[in-house]
From Swiss-Prot:
GO terms for cellular component: cytoplasm. Keywords: Cell cycle, Cell division, Chaperone, Cytoplasm, Isomerase, Rotamase. GO terms for biological process: 'de novo' cotranslational protein folding; cell division; chaperone-mediated protein folding; protein transport; protein unfolding. Involved in protein export. Acts as a chaperone by maintaining the newly synthesized protein in an open conformation. Functions as a peptidyl-prolyl cis-trans isomerase. It comes from Acidovorax ebreus (strain TPSY). HAMAP family: Trigger_factor_Tig (MF_00303). The lineage of its organism: Bacteria, Pseudomonadati, Pseudomonadota, Betaproteobacteria, Burkholderiales. It catalyses: [protein]-peptidylproline (omega=180) = [protein]-peptidylproline (omega=0). The keyword Cell wall biogenesis/degradation does not apply. This is Trigger factor.
Length: 436
């Protein structure tokens, strides 16, 4: 097979492939013979259809398949011999004027770029740190108590206040007409916890059992119910019951109910601290990893293969449609979503992927078996039966590949932090958790 390689521009290349017609015809004949042994046609016994009839019926499609296969094989062989790392699928077209006895094709494609990573010692990375405080443990204890609270009916003269559970009947109308989801009986919610729109909670707060009132409520423009979003409804609400919340005491009984082995408050707080420290570690790793990747990309020079960018745009577009479909949007598969919306994100993902791959290759940062095991053990530690979770990960190659990708990212993060100028910054627990 004769091969020529031509550089068009930047990452674009062209290979000219020449194939002997005899090679193609030999394969076509072989496939038609195999087909003749199994093909069924009216008027002939199975396996007894004449070759001329088989060729007349199936010759064109078989020749098309053979050409595709042979050109694909020739392209792969040529790219391999030329040490080309092909990005995406080639555009293959047949050329006119081929030498006698040959068929010639042009394959135009992109190659992956050379990645140049600058001096990482001049990169600056802000590295966050945070600690689990007693206050954070106290807040978690309060959350656990709320999850186990009980309710007791309050006196009829008592007014609803934050923390109470109220049972109400309500009906809303827009321009005098009822709307879907605007009416309910014996509906319960907790006042002051954001389960209802603020105007609704404000109206109920201070009401007593047996009282009714009407009030206007403006639905936000971004309200999930599109039929009422941005509109104002008139609501009638009747309070039927008000119940006060009672939180369990922080004692041995609470600790035991939460599965604490020694059944002590100290053991409960220690267990909470351990879990929060694990969460803090993962949050810090994610934030610091993002800072490292930003610094790494800023120090890299490379051209982006358009084929890779377009493939990433297609993935993001598919994910966006799936999200719309999950939200109940009609005809999500047909929704017009401009590709350019995803281009910046796609370009960053492709750029980051290529830079990370080069750093891993150049510095042997691949995931080691002991690192995979340690990471899986850490993921499994928070489960009731960690050994089952470990087996679950190692029993599936795809799941293990996801773990491997995370470990490689961690290796890259550690490597860059060891090279770059690191600015340490302590943040509060609440700030890290997005609660500040």
């Amino acid at each position: 097979m004769a091969v020529t390689v031509e550089t068009l521009e930047k990452l674009e290349r062209k290979i000219t492939l020449s194939l002997p017609l005899t090679t193609i015809q030999t394969e076509v004949d072989a496939r038609l013979k195999r087909l003749a042994r199994t093909v069924k046609m009216d008027g002939f016994r199975p396996g007894k259809v004449p070759m001329s009839v088989v060729a007349q019926r199936y010759g064109y499609s078989v020749q098309y398949e053979v050409l595709n296969d042979k050109v694909g094989e020739a392209f792969a062989q040529a790219a391999n011999e030329a040490n080309l790392r092909v990005a995406g699928q080639p555009r293959i077209t047949e050329k006119d004027g081929a030498p006698e006895g040959e068929v010639t094709f042009d394959a135009v494609f992109e190659v992956f770029p050379e990645v140049k990573i600058g001096d990482l010692s001049t990169a600056e990375v802000e590295k966050l740190s945070a600690e689990v405080t007693d206050s954070a443990i106290d807040k978690t204890v309060d959350i656990l108590r709320k999850q186990r609270r009980t309710f007791a009916q309050r006196a009829l003269a008592a007014a609803a206040e934050d923390g109470d559970r109220v049972t109400v009947d309500f009906e809303g109308k827009i321009d005098g007409e009822p709307f879907q989801g605007g009416k309910a009986e014996d509906f319960q919610f907790l006042v002051g916890e954001g389960q209802m729109l603020k105007e609704f909670e404000d109206a109920v707060r201070g009401m007593k059992s047996g009282e009714s009132k009407t009030f206007p409520l403006a639905f936000p423009e971004d309200y999930h119910g599109k039929d009422v979003a941005g509109k104002t409804a008139d609501f009638m609400v009747t309070v039927k019951k008000i119940e006060a919340a009672h939180l369990p005491e922080v004692n041995e009984q609470l600790a035991k109910s939460l599965g604490i082995a020694d059944g002590t408050v100290e053991g409960l707080r220690a267990d909470i601290k351990k879990n929060l420290e694990r969460e803090v570690k993962f949050r810090l790793l994610a934030r610091n990893k993002q800072a490292v990747m930003d610094a790494l990309v800023s120090k890299a020079e490379l051209d982006l293969p358009n084929a890779s960018v377009q493939a990433e745009i297609a993935r993001l577009l598919e994910a966006a449609r799936a999200d719309l479909k999950q939200r109940g949007i009609k005809d999500a598969d047909k929704a017009e979503i401009p590709e350019d919306v995803f281009r910046p994100q796609a370009e960053r993902r492709v750029r980051l992927g290529l830079v990370v791959a080069e750093l891993v290759r150049a510095n042997n940062l691949q995931a080691k078996p002991e690192q995979l095991k340690a990471h899986v053990d850490e993921l499994a530690a928070s489960y009731e039966k960690p050994e089952d979770v470990v087996r679950w990960y190692f029993s599936d190659r795809n799941r293990l590949a996801e773990v491997e990708a995370v470990v490689i990212e961690n290796n890259v993060t550690d490597f860059v932090l060891g090279q770059a100028k690191v600015n340490d910054k302590a943040v509060s627990f609440d700030e890290l958790m997005g609660q500040a």
